From Swiss-Prot:
Belongs to the universal ribosomal protein uS12 family. One of its GO terms (biological process) is translation. This is Small ribosomal subunit protein uS12. It comes from Geobacillus stearothermophilus. SUPFAM superfamilies: Nucleic acid-binding proteins (SSF50249). With S4 and S5 plays an important role in translational accuracy. Part of the 30S ribosomal subunit. Contacts proteins S8 and S17. May interact with IF1 in the 30S initiation complex. Gene3D superfamilies: Nucleic acid-binding proteins. Keywords: Methylation, Ribonucleoprotein, Ribosomal protein, RNA-binding, rRNA-binding, tRNA-binding. InterPro entries: NA-bd_OB-fold (IPR012340), Ribosomal_uS12 (IPR006032), Ribosomal_uS12_bac (IPR005679). GO terms for cellular component: small ribosomal subunit. The keyword Protein biosynthesis does not apply. The modification 3-methylthioaspartic acid is found at D102. CDD domains: Ribosomal_S12.
Length: 140
């Protein structure tokens, strides 16, 4: 327990907050060609590589991912959720934060149904998370 005198001489240190999705906290000023500290909830980017990755130890699968170059110049690895996708090398995608626990280095998700990314086909439950449209009611 510090004395009052010790606190006067050297105050309490603020805790440093470390972002879980740092690429979303940087903007880019194309006129000045410099990065800015403007955070955004989503960012647009172009796929540079699309592939599959194996998860960490207890799990086994081929998880789909894309390497994305964002509009602020940062390149990140993003997870492609849902069954099946239409992404290729120059597809324009929208990413959001949110890591995938069993994939190393994947801190972002691609938003299905945004820009070049199609929604998941034949999806009936949790449609909003996968960009699936409401099916038309069958005629009697």
């Amino acid at each position: 327990m510090p004395t009052i005198n010790q606190l006067v001489r050297k105050g309490r240190e603020k805790k440093v907050f470390k972002s879980k999705s740092p690429a979303l906290n940087k903007g880019y000023n194309s006129f000045k060609k410099e990065q800015t500290n403007v955070a955004s909830p989503q960012k647009r980017g172009v796929c540079t590589r699309v592939g599959t990755m194996t998860p960490k130890k207890p799990n086994s699968a081929l998880r789909k991912y894309a390497r994305v170059r964002l509009t602020n110049g940062i390149e990140v690895t993003a997870y492609i959720p849902g069954i099946g996708h239409n992404l290729q090398e120059h597809s324009v995608v929208l990413i959001r934060g949110g890591r995938v626990k069993d994939l190393r280095g994947v801190r972002y998700h691609i938003i299905r149904g945004g820009l070049d990314t199609a929604g998941v086909a034949n999806r009936m439950q949790g449609r909003s998370k996968y960009g699936a449209k409401k099916p038309k009611a069958a005629k009697k």
